[in-house]
Amino acid sequence: GEGVALGLVDVAVMEDFVASQNRHGLAVEIVDARRIRELHPHVTDRVIASTYSARDSQVNPMLLMKGFFLGATAKGLTFLRRSRPESLSPRNGRWEIKLSTGETLETGSVVNAAGAWANEICGLLGLEFPIAPRKGQVLVTEQLPPLGATNVWSAQYIVSKLRPAGVPAPGAAPWMSGPEEARKAADFGLGFAFTGTHSGNYLIGSTRENAGFDKTTVPEALGLLARQVIHYFPVMKDVHFIRTFAGLRPSTPDGMPVIGEVPGFPGFFMAAGHEGDGIALSPITGRVTADLVEGRKPEFSLESFRPERFLEGQGDLDEAASG
């Protein structure tokens, strides 16, 4: 994939991003305008640099989820449809879960991997984690021939994705009409992502909005997305959009997921808050969470993801757990 830069500020963002990726052993580099146009002949001449990784790839999340489901059921998973936990109680070193279907389950461990709804599960224990839904609106195009060799993101999309809550958004992009449109784009958390699919449709996004559980799409935001993609890829001016949709990402204030056993609640584990990286990080999250549940030391440090960082000031956790 590529993260494209339109100006020197964007290049600085990309340089920091690439340096971080390289420190972790990932094969990512910055390429010049000539190489960009070899990969993407339709991109605007305003793009001056880009990140590039030949190892970047994408998956269909629905097929991935189906694969996880089939693999897990083959190993003994029981999947309960149309049921939700209504109470969650520690009982003599185990957990009792009462479901909306009237069924009661007993287990030694509970893993809260409920995504944007994870805090609702925590609420059953009197806990509160700042895991909140962050809406993303997306345009879907008609089927097209391939427009380039990779998926494309803007430097500002990376900033929007990684920027912790409360940090000012980037300024006006060159395609915006002025400060008012820049303000609206900042309110929507606008970033640029241009992703092809195996069927030939392109997904164009996206916003990052703190809008609760509202998944409606907004014409004003969609219009900004359309204008933005035409700026990066002028060939898109005559392309038809066939539908729109919005989804929810489970976000945290510091941009890090919450992974680990909750202090004071033995056997209750968090694995949520990955925002838009949940699909990419699902295999490793499953592995380290399984290690924790089984009492093994994970291969990787989970220090940055500790649940404790969000629990200060929430009273006596041991008393809450025993209650």
Question: Where are each of the predicted segments found?
Answer:
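Helical element adjacent to the flavin cofactor pocket in flavoenzyme catalytic cores
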Residues: 51-109, 117
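Short loop/edge segments at beta-strand edges and connector loops
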Residues: 32-33, 81-83, 243
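A short, glycine/Asx- and small/polar-enriched loop/turn
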Residues: 13, 40-47, 89-96, 251-255, ...
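Short, solvent-exposed loop/turn elements at beta->coil junctions and helix N-caps
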Residues: 37, 85-87, 244-249
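Dinucleotide-binding Rossmann-like beta1-alpha1 core, especially the glycine-rich loop
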Residues: 1-39, 192
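C-terminal lid/capping helical subdomain adjacent to the catalytic/cofactor pocket in oxidative enzymes
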Residues: 30, 35, 77, 95, ...
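Active-site substrate-recognition segment that forms the wall
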Residues: 104-105, 114-244, 248-263
